[in-house]
């Protein structure tokens, strides 16, 4: 029975739960790695050893957080749980493929961990640029294992994307048009399209790197007529859409949370929200070289990528102001989920502003590979994606489990986390503007103060993570049943009770849309 339910599962709710548990577990590993980084940087001088081990930790931290925490939780966890419920489908379109998508992730994670255990580990950074990732600078199997890990995670995501696209387009009730699906469903659909289009390019790039390392090809080796810049183009053509893949489902969740706790029956500017997400998805594919301003591009090329990157601020602004307009005039309920959503809007906007700074190629040439960039993307990820995940978790936890979290603890948790992440990442803007470079385990004494502050902040965040584990235990131990859910007609995922039955629909849904 246990094997049938959890190993061979074809139920979207169980697979969603598996994704959430796996993501939480990987998140702990990723957090541990980040604390090692901040412990090393807490003061000048060496703590862990040389720069190789430090860079192995940095690389693993990035891969674990992106591929094994944010993506499994947002797309696999919330996506699997909520999309079928929100469109009235009995399950996903391909339930067994859904199971395979999940079970490709633990072996992938295992390969990534193995890569750090053999030889010297993969100290390449998550970008895995040759020639550093080549077989001279990284002899041994480490980088090869990392590449295989990425292949598995990529196949998992591509299969999941096919599944979501098919489900969302094909399994709605006949009366429901695409423009009547909730915004979270839209966000997952657009994310899935981005995955489907970008991951094969990454697969091509890392496969060429694999053959360069092992089969004597020279795709990225000038000695044989290759070009390492080609790898950068292939990687970032995936890498930039990837960062939008990480944030788009969060946009969808924030729209639902803000609408719900403002007491509104729909978000402000539904169509604008949809078109904004589609625009962001499209533009995400034509700005990749802004990660490469320092490789020596023409001034015309730089001008194009600068302008195109800034254009993304427009649909993003549409979303931010629509969330604020949804709040306007509402009967606002200051629940923990609402606090996460408001924190998301504020901090994501701050991260977006530093992004506009970095979009200027002239400025980026100075700021590239400094802590300013680290501060920028951690504001949009560590306070964008993670805040969206936390908001979604405390909002939908009663739906998933049937129990309620303690409100006071949840608010305390938010406060500690808010202080922690800001104390960690705000000082990094100062470090970057002062020229402290990324990916080094040691630094001149002049940078000590802000690094110490940053490292203290990371330990405050650790306290918040531990408090969250306690909160979840407390909820399951206290067994407070869900009393009543408001607004069920506009939030149909709640319609079937908390938690919903194992099989939501025994027969196809019939929807009458006025």
UniProtKB/Swiss-Prot annotation:
Component of the cytochrome c oxidase (complex IV, CIV), a multisubunit enzyme composed of 14 subunits. The complex is composed of a catalytic core of 3 subunits MT-CO1, MT-CO2 and MT-CO3, encoded in the mitochondrial DNA, and 11 supernumerary subunits COX4I, COX5A, COX5B, COX6A, COX6B, COX6C, COX7A, COX7B, COX7C, COX8 and NDUFA4, which are encoded in the nuclear genome. Binds 2 heme A groups non-covalently per subunit. Binds a copper B center. Disulfide bonds: none annotated. One of its GO terms (molecular function) is heme binding. This is Cytochrome c oxidase subunit 1. Its EC number is 7.1.1.9. There is a cross-link at residues 240-244 (1'-histidyl-3'-tyrosine (His-Tyr)). The gene is MT-CO1. O2 binds at residue 244. Residues 41-50, 118-140, 213-227, 287-298, 358-370, 434-446 are mitochondrial intermembrane. It comes from Halichoerus grypus. Its main location: mitochondrion. It catalyses: 4 Fe(II)-[cytochrome c] + O2 + 8 H(+)(in) = 4 Fe(III)-[cytochrome c] + 2 H2O + 4 H(+)(out).
